[in-house]
């Protein structure tokens, strides 16, 4: 096999026909400015082709289920292995997906509990023993005299299939009837089952009535049932209505005192995704949705007449509305009127308003469309009325008023009481999953068993320990297995999948990772690099898109893509060992690695306006009654190891409180006693890396408001006025000026059954999105299509005499986006580019000097050169008197902040406290701070 991966003529996106040779079975870092073409090379070329070749080798039937990728624009790739991509975007939002299920540790735990678990009665907690035939018969005979019942043999429990053999075996054994999914059938008739649905089948062994002379017959029937279903029997007690309760018995396990039988323990019983083990109330989700009174009443100072209830249908409650007269009548009984502020409602009155007035009836005149209707009716309460509407009309609108609460039956534990009664080492499966990874490893290592159980558990424990160690090696020791996958950050989810891949121990694979260091503190970087090297040493090629200096220096080979971004990028600037790249004069990466270039430390720090945002008693997630002050008018960095509580403090508490109180948004802040100092601010703006739009129609021009100015400009031209065109004519989102053949998209989607959908340029407008009449309207000789195809840099020159347009374009240029097209589809922008479009939009607005900007890891996806530009923008915002709060791990950005709030000292349970505050120099001197230790070196204080 070739010792290199050879790429020739790569032309995907902005790649300029590049040729590149990458060594196989090495740790290779692809780096370069944001938008330089790194992802195009790594994911759209190498991964796409590696995955495509693998999928192409499968049958056409298999390809239907495997989403095939386009063949990338590349002349040749040699030495390519099957590719696995580990990026940030594929985090499961399924509430059933947890850290335990994603890493497969939960599967091994289920096996462990099924094989060596000790069952306990869920009522009394006593250890459960096996039942004998005589004990089972005695229990049945204890039923009241005259009770009619059936003896059933449970042969299939919630299993897919047609189960023809089960029916055939039952016929051969002389049985006459079966119960399938609760329905009775004669075995003489043909029973056709859907093989894709789970079925439960019981053979009816006997029908009996409790009398004094049935012991012998009952004993024979029970014995027959036990024999057929491997030690289990069900007794269906039939009452006169045909309904009845079921009693389950097992020769395996049962609590004699409470008559509770356990089936034989098997792994699927411990799965919350299987109906056998899942909590019957919440079906294994662990929580339930209900209407939140807190969300219905965001502002308690309002009255019912003034819109105190935030839901449509209840916002305007007056005497001449439909619901108003009824609520006013209820108010007479409970001491409120439509003009009583909700904050003054008694507990009883609020309960009646929300959950109803019981059986009381009210005679009222209700109005609809100005017409009155006399009615005598009960009042169900606003919550119940909304629930009824949700059932009848679907609940999309009402979702914003719904909250998730722990299931009242399982209390969020997802499993049935019976399953939670099984323990290993004194803990049930939920309790062990609630431990942090670090504590769970210590617990697993301390387990001791008898001789036989030790033999059974040995291999299972070995797999569990290995996977827990892999999670610790990627810096995730603070997580627990019951954490839902949807609540993980992109970096955490990526590192979990990385740990899972190491656990699978594949060799000869091409792994492509997208910035695995995101969200990771410098302290844990060494662990991550060790993990990447471990993956390489198994015999794999590891290609990492990364900007982290430590990772680059630890790599075997660096590829620097550039030299600039967008149209100025797409070339290979340098390729070689870290030492070779350092020496390359053309490489910006080399300049930063060698120290020729560096981000400067400010000569002085802002002291701020003298006012503070004072947060008191923050207790969200792992925060431990935290008190912290944020100086206004400064650039503040919030730091700490992963899981220390940064996002809980800033995103869940601070941002949501500010958005609610300053922006009047409907948000629900995390647990905090108080936040004061809001009177010194006028609004809060969160700038993240989420896309600026989800469709190809969205672009930087539409997001920044530039497109409105451009359309107005074209509508004001002589040509447009002569034809009677207004600004709407120049929109590709509405009929009129757009090309109707492609509906303004510029491309058409051709569906291909066994191949990926193909997008072809519209043959009518040739990809220009507008019809010919619209394109005939020119400004300075350019059509609207020509303007949207210009780069921001070209646009500044073109619109030189138009201050409003030029200002918006200039801010895009200032944030380093001079290379992107004015009308470039938002779906093609990277996270870093999308964030800078948002920053540019803010910079182009007139500053009030009283705004607070909140950014969560803004350096994600940014090269050191881009970080330098980002810092300049943030400093510019702070220079205007605004407050900038940034959650960050990047030391280059942290060292330029005016003030640092360092949380920790560890992640998870070991975090949530204030470790250090002050200027970077002050935090660097704090011995307890991990951030301070790394800052000392950056600031040259060590």
Where does each model-flagged region fall?
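Conserved phosphate-binding elements of NTP-dependent enzyme cores
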Residues: 1-942
């Amino acid at each position: 096999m070739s010792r290199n991966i050879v790429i020739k003529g790569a032309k995907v996106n902005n790649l300029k026909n590049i040729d590149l040779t990458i060594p196989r079975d090495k740790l290779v870092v692809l780096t370069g400015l944001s938008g330089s073409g790194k992802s195009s090379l790594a994911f759209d070329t190498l991964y796409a082709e590696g995955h495509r070749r693998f999928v192409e080798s499968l049958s056409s039937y298999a390809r239907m289920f495997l989403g095939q990728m386009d063949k990338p624009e590349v002349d040749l790739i040699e030495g390519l292995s099957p590719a696995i991509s580990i990026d940030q975007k594929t985090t499961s939002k399924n509430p059933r997906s947890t850290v335990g299920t994603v890493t497969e540790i939960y599967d091994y735990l289920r096996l462990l509990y099924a094989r060596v678990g000790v069952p306990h009665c869920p009522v009394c907690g006593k250890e459960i023993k096996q039942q004998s035939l005589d004990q089972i018969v005695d229990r049945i005979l204890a039923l009241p005299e005259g009770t009619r019942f059936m003896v059933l043999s449970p042969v299939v429990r919630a299993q897919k299939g047609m189960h023809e053999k089960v029916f055939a075996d039952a016929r051969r054994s002389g049985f006459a009837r079966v119960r399938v999914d609760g329905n009775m059938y004669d075995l003489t008739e043909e029973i056709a089952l859907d093989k894709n649905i789970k079925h439960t089948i019981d053979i009816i062994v006997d029908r009996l009535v409790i009398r004094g002379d049935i012991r012998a017959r009952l004993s024979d029937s029970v014995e027959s049932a036990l024999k057929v279903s491997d030690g289990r029997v069900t007794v269906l007690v039939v009452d006169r209505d045909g309904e009845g309760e079921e009693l389950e018995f097992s020769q395996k396990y049962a609590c004699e005192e409470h008559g509770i039988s356990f089936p034989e323990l098997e792994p699927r019983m411990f799965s919350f995704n299987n109906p056998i083990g899942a909590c019957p109330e919440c079906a294994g989700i662990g929580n339930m949705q209900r209407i939140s009174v807190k969300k219905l009443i965001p502002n308690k100072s309002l009255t019912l007449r003034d819109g105190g209830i935030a839901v449509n249908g209840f916002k305007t409650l007056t005497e001449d509305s439909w619901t108003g007269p009824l609520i006013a009548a209820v108010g007479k009984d409970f001491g409120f009127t439509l003009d009583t502020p909700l904050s003054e409602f008694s507990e009883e009155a609020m309960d009646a308003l929300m959950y109803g007035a019981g059986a009381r009836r009210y005679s009222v005149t209700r109005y609809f469309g100005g017409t009155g209707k006399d009615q005598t009716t009960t009042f169900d309460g606003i919550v119940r009325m909304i629930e009824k509407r949700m059932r009848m009309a679907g609940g999309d609108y009402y979702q914003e008023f719904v909250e998730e609460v722990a299931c009242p039956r399982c209390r969020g534990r997802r499993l049935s009481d019976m399953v939670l009664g099984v323990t290993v080492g004194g803990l049930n499966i939920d309790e062990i999953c609630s431990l942090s990874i670090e504590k769970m490893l210590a617990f697993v290592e301390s387990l001791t068993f008898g001789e036989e159980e030790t033999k059974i558990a040995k291999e299972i424990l070995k797999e569990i320990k290995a996977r827990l160690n892999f999670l610790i090696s990627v810096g995730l020791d603070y997580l627990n297995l019951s954490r839902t996958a949807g609540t993980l950050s992109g970096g955490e989810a990526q590192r979990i999948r990385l740990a899972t891949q190491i656990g699978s121990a594949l060799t000869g694979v091409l792994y492509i990772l997208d910035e695995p260091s995101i969200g990771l503190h410098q302290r844990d970087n060494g662990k991550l690099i060790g993990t990447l090297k471990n993956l390489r040493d198994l015999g794999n090629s590891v290609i990492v898109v990364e900007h982290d200096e430590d990772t680059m220096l630890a790599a075997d080979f660096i590829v620097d893509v550039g030299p600039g971004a967008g149209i100025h990028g797409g070339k290979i600037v340098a390729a070689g060992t870290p030492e070779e790249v350092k020496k390359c004069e053309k490489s910006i990466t080399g300049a930063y690695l060698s120290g020729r270039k560096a981000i400067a430390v400010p000569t002085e720090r802002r002291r701020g306006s003298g006012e503070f945002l004072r947060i008191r008693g923050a207790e969200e997630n792992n925060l431990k009654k935290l008190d912290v002050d944020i100086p206004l008018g400064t650039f503040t960095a919030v730091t700490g190891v992963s899981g220390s509580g940064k996002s809980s403090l800033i995103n869940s508490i601070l941002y949501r409180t500010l958005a609610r109180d300053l922006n009047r948004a409907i948000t629900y802040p995390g647990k905090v006693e108080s936040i004061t100092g809001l009177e010194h601010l006028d609004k809060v703006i969160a700038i993240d890396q989420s896309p600026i739009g989800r469709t190809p129609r969205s672009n930087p021009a539409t997001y920044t408001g530039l497109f409105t100015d451009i359309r107005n400009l074209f509508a004001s031209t002589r040509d447009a006025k002569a034809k009677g065109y207004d600004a709407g004519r120049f929109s590709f989102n509405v009929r009129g000026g757009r090309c109707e053949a492609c509906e303004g998209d510029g491309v058409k989607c051709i569906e291909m059954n066994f191949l990926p959908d193909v997008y072809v340029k519209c043959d009518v407008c040739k990809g220009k999105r507008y019809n010919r009449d619209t394109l005939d309207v020119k400004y300075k000789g350019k059509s609207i299509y020509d303007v949207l195809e210009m780069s921001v840099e070209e646009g500044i020159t073109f619109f030189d005499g138009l201050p409003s347009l030029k200002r918006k374009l200039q801010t895009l240029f200032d944030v380093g986006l001079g290379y992107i097209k004015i009308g470039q589809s938002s779906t093609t922008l990277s996270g870093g580019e999308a964030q800078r479009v948002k920053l540019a939009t803010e910079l182009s607005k007139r500053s009030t000097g009283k705004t607070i900007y909140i950014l969560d890891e803004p350096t994600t996806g940014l090269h050191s050169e881009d970080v330098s530009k980002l810092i300049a923008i943030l400093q510019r915002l702070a220079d205007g008197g605004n407050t900038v709060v940034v959650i960050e791990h990047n030391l280059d950005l942290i060292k330029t902040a005016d003030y640092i709030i360092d949380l920790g000292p560890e992640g998870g349970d070991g975090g949530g406290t204030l470790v250090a505050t002050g200027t970077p120099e002050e935090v660097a001197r704090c011995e307890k701070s991990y951030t301070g230790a790394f800052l000392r070196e950056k600031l040259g204080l060590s």
